UniProtKB/Swiss-Prot annotation:
It is found in: Cell inner membrane. NCBIfam families: stp. This is Serine transporter SdaC. The chain crosses the membrane at residues 31-51, 91-111, 131-151, 155-175, 186-206, 240-260, 286-306, 338-358, 361-381, 391-411. Belongs to the amino acid/polyamine transporter 2 family. SdaC/TdcC subfamily. One of its GO terms (molecular function) is amino acid transmembrane transporter activity. Keywords: Amino-acid transport, Cell inner membrane, Cell membrane, Membrane, Symport, Transmembrane, Transmembrane helix, Transport. Mediates the import of L-serine into the cell. Is energized by proton cotransport. InterPro entries: Amino_acid_transport_2, Hydroxy_aa_transpt. It is a multi-pass membrane protein. It catalyses: L-serine(in) + H(+)(in) = L-serine(out) + H(+)(out). The keyword Glycoprotein does not apply.
């Protein structure tokens, strides 16, 4: 196939596109209109223009980094060691694991809280035993990951279709309620730039699907057998994932922001409730609030699978680096599954409040791995030189540094 020939969508690429979408869209999508829209409408417009290319180029760069190994099919933990040496490889793998693992803990906790809340508030039943409920939910999620890749991708596909449909229908449903108040609120230049700076990380992490990129890249190579074939299909699939993320998520965000006044967005933030709960109260329409737990359930479950892949790679990569010898991968898979089951179950029972802080500490690490590491590799690693000289490299580096500086500022 000539490199200039336009790729057609096939079932394999489309399924992975939906998986990457599912990995990115977690329960945070229900708070995104509040967090992203509080700074006003016009900064949001500029961010919507920036975030699409930012998502595509950054994730494509990370995928090309994984693909650049001289040993085809190597995952990210093996590639960092190959390119940066054993010590740096161990350190990056450790950071990679500890950036993703807290998100997995939050999802184990979040799915328990979501189902428990639905049983109590929507079904009007008594709260089930948390120990049993959390074990069943987490065990089911992890058991899916023990099946082969095709089963996991198929289940993710079933979850993402209704998720996309609900977000789209809600966005359309709100159109008659749009008001023009936010269009006439013009921030000062300083206020505009500050809002842009502080809100970029909100969108970056809402569109982040880097935990699934390594598994996605390895899967693409297994499917297409050659470097050129995998490279083209990676770019094609990633472009599709970034496009549907931009359209469906940002349409939902804009529809919510245009429905509420700036004061109402601030009130929603102060009440610390999801956008759907706030809209249900505003319009006195309980049916909207019914979608909240459903969207949260679909988003957490589909995102869980992508983050599990990343956390598993990190943990198994650490073990293999420490062990330094060949091991039975199937046994290792079951051992890591047991580790995740016990840790996620324990955290879901305790329901600690410190998880959010731990997750926020992982933010700069994820941004470094996603934005800076592949761009650094393009300059320093011979296998990545083929990607040098592109304007997109400068764009990703600058946006990555802006995102990291804003995340670090937010932690201070």
């Amino acid at each position: 196939m000539k490199s200039t020939e336009k790729l057609k969508w096939n079932k394999f690429d489309a399924t992975w596109m939906l998986n990457l979408f599912g990995t990115a869209v977690g329960a945070g999508v229900l708070f995104l209109p509040i967090n992203a829209g509080m700074g006003g409408f016009w900064p949001l417009v500029l961010m919507a223009i920036i975030v699409g290319p930012m998502t595509y180029f950054a994730h494509r760069g990370l995928a090309y980094f994984v693909l650049s190994s001289k040993n085809p099919g190597s995952d990210i933990t093996e590639v960092v060691e190959e390119h940066f040496g054993k010590t740096a490889g161990k350190l990056i793998t450790l950071l990679y694991f500890f950036a993703i693992f807290p998100i997995l803990l939050i999802y184990g906790n979040g799915i328990t809280n979501t189902v428990d809340s639905f049983i109590v508030n929507q079904l009007g039943m008594a709260s089930p035993n948390r120990v049993i409920l959390s074990f069943v939910l987490i065990a089911v999620l992890i058991s899916v990951m023990l099946f082969n890749e095709k089963v996991m991708l198929k289940i993710t596909e079933w979850l993402v279709y209704p998720l996309v449909l609900i977000l789209f229908v809600l966005s359309i449903y709100l159109i008659p309620e749009w008001n023009s108040a936010v269009l006439y609120e013009f921030p000062t230049v300083g206020g505009f730039l500050t809002t842009l700076w502080l809100t970029i990380p909100v969108l970056v992490f809402s569109f982040n699907h880097s935990p699934a990129i390594s598994s996605f890249t390895c899967s693409q190579f297994r499917e297409y057998k050659t470097f050129d074939g995998a490279e083209r299909h990676i770019s094609h699939t990633e472009k599709g994932a970034s496009t549907i993320l931009l359209f469906f998520v940002m349409f939902f965000v804009f529809s919510c922001v245009l429905t509420l006044t700036p004061e109402e967005l601030v009130a929603a933030k102060e009440q610390n409730i999801s956008i759907l709960s706030f809209l249900a109260n505003k319009f006195d329409n309980p049916y909207i609030s019914y979608f909240g737990p459903l969207v949260a359930f679909l988003a957490i479950t589909s995102s869980f699978f992508g983050h599990y892949m990343g956390a598993r790679e990190g943990l198994e990569g650490l073990y293999l680096k420490m062990k330094g010898e060949a091991v039975n991968r199937k046994k290792l898979n079951y051992a890591t599954a047991l580790f995740f089951l016990l840790t996620l179950w324990g955290v879901a029972i305790i329901n600690p409040s410190i998880l959010g802080l731990i997750e926020s500490l992982g933010g700069p690490i994820i941004a470094m791995i996603l934005f800076i590491m592949p761009m650094y590799a393009i300059r320093k690693i011979p296998a990545m030189k083929r990607y040098s000289g592109r304007f997109s490299n400068v764009f990703v580096t600058i946006m990555g540094l802006i995102a990291i500086s804003a995340v670090v500022y937010g932690l201070l």
